[in-house]
Every structure is written in structure tokens, then in C-alpha cells.
């Protein structure tokens, strides 16, 4: 309640309401806290929840994780487990450093509890992330996922080599890797969800560490089924469902102007479709392919419904923006019984 009544209004006023300014401020502050062990201990005592489960060979202290995009460069890593997250996914990171799309590129739709982003994989590059992870003073204590994307300067026909370069730089640090082939903000990226492209990509990456595929909610079920065939045939460890959507269904009237911004939509309007995709993946694969459910989780009930749809784990991004760490704790507590 303190977050929603006091902290969030102040964050939302930063930079004259610019969402990315608030995001950067939050990550900087958490990076500062991450260097203070006593502060981390206080946060852990308040927000930590034990609800362990093992998925794709990894033990998770609880099944509620931080989605990619919140801490792209891993600058605040020790803070996220202290806020209750049972795993953390950094990135999306690319082989080449890149600035992303021009600002403004992140927009809040508060009445809809949603966000539109067209960030464009802004990140410092795989090499910089590897150096930061190598310098961590102690183990994170939760599984670390690393989301990999294609560099904008890399042509589609060289995508496999681009992903491989990032993987090779980071394979010693990630507990699992997420292949992001579904962001709507990198031209041509979603073509990598096609059978031939995805088959070549997974053939190059699957092996040493668990590799998951992050899919778009805008794919028809027939295309998802084809993608799942490739994942099973190539030994992918799981699927992350879903990325942001290009659809604009379910927006509140006051958010129509913000919703007209180009980019991917996340948050409450995505919840139903994300659950549908999770359920489809779980049913289509007979539970053989673990699913990480992400999209529209803003309450503990939303998390429970995602688990009921077939998710083994869930991730938060937009829900964390609007509800803060109390949502992490409540969602993890609701998941104590798998």
C-alpha cells in the first residue's frame, strides 16, 4: 500500500511523467541498495517467500521471476532476489552494443494498468554484461536467466552467428538462456519464429545450458503448434509465453491516445491472451515443455490463474511497475502449493 499511495505517485511524476526516466531512476536506486548488505537483509526479511520448485533442472526458491527488460544490463542484480523474486532474467542483450530506438519510447497507460514500449533492445552489449556478471562479489542465490536478441545491425541471414556470439560471451554466467525472437521492436525479428529460422537457431544454441524460446502472443495457434514441434525436436528446455502484443484490445478510454503509440503492449489487456497461449502450449505438448507465463499479472489471483493454465513459473514486469514488490511477495505466497 505504501508503494501504491506514496512511492508510485512520486515515481510517475519524475521527468515530467516520462516513464523511462522513472525506470532508470528505480534501477539506479536499486543498484545503490545492492551494494549495502544490511539493506538487502531488511528487504529479504520483508519480501522473501519460500515456495521452492524445480523446473528444467534448476531449483527456484519460488516461482515468481523478474521478466527481461527491467534490468537489461544487470546493474541491480543483488537487489531483485531481496525484493522476493525467485529468479531474475536480464537483457534482452545483443552481441553488439546498441542505443535502441529514439526517446520517448516507453509509455504508461495507467487506467488500463498497461505499458507500451518500443525500446529496441537498448543495451551495453553481451561483452559488457559478461564483465559485470564476472565482477559480482557473491552468488546471486537464485537462477539467473539471460535473454538473447539479434543486433539491429546484423542481417537476418546472419542471426544465428549473432545469437551464438552473445551466448559464447555469457554461457559461463547464465543458468538458463531465453531466445527472444518475438519482440515487435526490432525489424524482421519475428521472422525468426518461422520453422526454418528457429530450427537453425536452436540447433546452434541448445546443449550446455537450458534454452527457452520466448514467443509472441500475436501468432495463431497453428503457427505456435509448428514452433512447438521445433522446440521439442531440438531439445528446447521450455517456452516463455508471451512477449508484448501489437494488439490494442481492452484499453480504457483515457488510454486510447497512449495506446496509439507504436510498440508492444504489456499489462492487463494482455492477460487473457497470455493465459490462452500458456494453456495451448501446455496442452499441445502434454506438459512436456515447461512454460514460463508472463503477461498481465497484476494480482496474486492473476498469478494463480496463470499457474492453473499450465505455467510452471511466472514473470512480472508491468505488474511490478504498478504494484511494486508487494505483488512479488503475494504472488509467491499464492504459489506455495504447486
From Swiss-Prot:
Pathway: Pyrimidine metabolism; UMP biosynthesis via de novo pathway; orotate from (S)-dihydroorotate (quinone route): step 1/1. GO terms for biological process: 'de novo' pyrimidine nucleobase biosynthetic process; 'de novo' UMP biosynthetic process. FMN binds at residues 68-72, 92, 147, 180, 214, 242, 267, 296, 317-318. Its main location: membrane. Keywords: Cell membrane, Flavoprotein, FMN, Membrane, Oxidoreductase, Pyrimidine biosynthesis. Its EC number is 1.3.5.2. This is Dihydroorotate dehydrogenase (quinone). It catalyses: (S)-dihydroorotate + a quinone = orotate + a quinol. CDD domains: DHOD_2_like. Binds 1 FMN per subunit. It is found in: Cell membrane. The active site is at residue 183. Monomer. Belongs to the dihydroorotate dehydrogenase family. Type 2 subfamily. It is an enzyme of class 1 (oxidoreductase). One of its GO terms (molecular function) is dihydroorotate dehydrogenase (quinone) activity. It comes from the Bacteria. GO terms for cellular component: cytoplasm; plasma membrane. Catalyzes the conversion of dihydroorotate to orotate with quinone as electron acceptor. The keyword Amino-acid biosynthesis does not apply. Substrate binds at residues 72, 117-121, 180, 185, 243-244. It is a peripheral membrane protein. The keyword Oxidoreductase applies. Its cofactor is FMN.
